[in-house]
């Protein structure tokens, strides 16, 4: 299967997202090309990964690098959202500094979204910025979190509240890694693909409705979905790198979704990010309908598609008890899009007609949350 390349074109930095099977075998060439180096013998690499990816794929990557006489420093953290913390960040930083890696050396984030965010944030602050390469191993990371330069960790006050924009030198998305991805994780990544259609690509959403089963089977349709998703996000990031405008549209479903992740204490047994986004997108459409922005039939269509692939779509699908509406409101108030204490949501006027809604009434949001919680109690 042919390798595809999507280029992220920024004002001060351009980089490639390379997509296709068997890219680990080409990793050395891709890394040399992206770092503009003839050889890598004098460059050391911190391989930041998690316990799950390490057990499945780390030996393969290390063998490829070692074969080319490249020095590596593997750094393995616990798998899961809870590793996006100050404690784990400190561990990663200490390992890199103890190995005396320099600014001209490189951090490779080898894993899913958590590892990309964690490794990228470490690279951004060590020696005021090291070389950084993303090697995403999950669908969600390949089509979303590895693209665009967002890095960071969570706080007890909310998700992704501590971080930096720090673009990688390249993204190497080997689709073979998806063959070992648990179905639950694949579904979670698919939610972010659906998001791209709902934002402003109704034709893409309709294509997903017809082709989702092929995407869940390894083949050219899966690669096409990944490429189209990366291209869509790359185009938005190129126009708005630091999220001062339209890039906020990429947060469709995330205001409610991040609220739910924080409310469940980032417990992956209850909820993972893509699942939270799926529920969040349904909530965003329901809230839009409550504000008389859309016909309720669109909610049914969106929810039906997410359910068809096995994603949760309602609060009742989350195991365990959720906090009261007032507590959930305090979590929403910490959302990154809040400006001058005004709530900002990504809402919709129709299929593929999402927009940034500023100064949303807190009273309307609170009443909506109370209604949704009442439905499950």
From Swiss-Prot:
Stated role: Catalyzes the conversion of 3-deoxy-D-arabino-heptulosonate 7-phosphate (DAHP) to dehydroquinate (DHQ).
InterPro entries attached to this UniProt entry: Dehydroquinate_synthase, DHQ_synth_AroB, DHQ_synth_fam, DHQS/DOIS_N, DHQS_C
Keyword Zinc carried by entry: yes
Residue numbers binding Zn(2+): 192, 254, 273
High-level lineage: Bacteria, Pseudomonadati, Pseudomonadota, Alphaproteobacteria, Hyphomicrobiales
Residue numbers binding NAD(+): 113-117, 137-138, 150, 159, 177-180
Principal location listed in the UniProt entry: cytoplasm
Protein name per the record: 3-dehydroquinate synthase
One cellular component term from this protein's GO annotations in UniProt: cytoplasm
Cell location: Cytoplasm
Listed HAMAP family: DHQ_synthase
Keywords: Amino-acid biosynthesis, Aromatic amino acid biosynthesis, Cobalt, Cytoplasm, Lyase, Metal-binding, NAD, Nucleotide-binding, Zinc
Pfam family, one: DHQ_synthase
Record-stated family: Belongs to the sugar phosphate cyclases superfamily. Dehydroquinate synthase family.
Catalytic activity: 7-phospho-2-dehydro-3-deoxy-D-arabino-heptonate = 3-dehydroquinate + phosphate
Gene: aroB
Presence of keyword Coiled coil: no
């Amino acid at each position: 299967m042919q390798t595809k390349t999507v280029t992220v074109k920024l004002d001060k930095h351009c980089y490639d997202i390379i997509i296709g099977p068997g890219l680990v075998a080409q990793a050395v060439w891709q890394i040399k090309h992206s770092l503009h180096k003839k050889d890598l013998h004098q460059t050391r690499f911190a391989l930041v990964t998690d316990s799950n990816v390490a057990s499945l794929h780390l030996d393969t990557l290390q063998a490829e690098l070692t074969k080319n006489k490249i020095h590596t420093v593997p750094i393995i953290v616990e798998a899961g959202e809870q590793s996006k913390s100050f404690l784990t960040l400190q561990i990663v930083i200490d390992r890199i500094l103890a190995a005396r890696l320099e600014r001209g050396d490189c951090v490779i984030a080898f894993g899913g979204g958590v590892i990309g965010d964690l490794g990228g944030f470490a690279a951004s602050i060590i020696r005021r910025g090291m070389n950084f390469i993303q090697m995403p191993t999950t669908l969600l990371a390949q089509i979303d979190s590895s693209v665009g330069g967002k890095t960071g960790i969570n706080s007890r006050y909310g998700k992704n509240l501590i971080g930096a924009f720090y673009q990688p030198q390249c993204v190497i998305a080997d689709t073979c890694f998806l063959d070992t991805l648990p179905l639950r994780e694949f579904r979670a990544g698919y939610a972010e693909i659906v998001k791209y259609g709902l934002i402003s690509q109704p034709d893409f959403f309709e294509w997903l409705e017809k082709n989702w089963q092929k995407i869940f089977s390894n083949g050219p349709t899966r690669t096409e979905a990944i490429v189209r998703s990366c291209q869509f996000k790359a185009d938005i990031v190129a126009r708005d790198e630091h999220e001062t405008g339209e890039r906020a549209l990429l947060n469709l479903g995330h205001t409610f979704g991040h609220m739910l992740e924080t409310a469940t204490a980032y417990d992956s047994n209850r909820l993972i990010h893509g699942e939270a986004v799926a529920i969040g997108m349904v909530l965003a459409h329901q809230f839009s309908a409550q504000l008389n922005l859309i016909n309720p039939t669109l909610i049914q269509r969106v929810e039906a598609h997410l359910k068809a692939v096995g994603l949760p779509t309602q609060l009742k699908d989350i195991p365990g008890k959720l906090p009261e509406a007032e507590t959930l409101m305090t979590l929403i108030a910490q959302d990154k899009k809040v400006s001058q204490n005004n709530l900002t949501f990504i809402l919709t006027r129709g299929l593929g007609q999402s927009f940034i809604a500023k100064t949303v009434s807190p009273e309307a949001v609170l009443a909506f949350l109370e209604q949704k919680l009442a439905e499950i109690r």
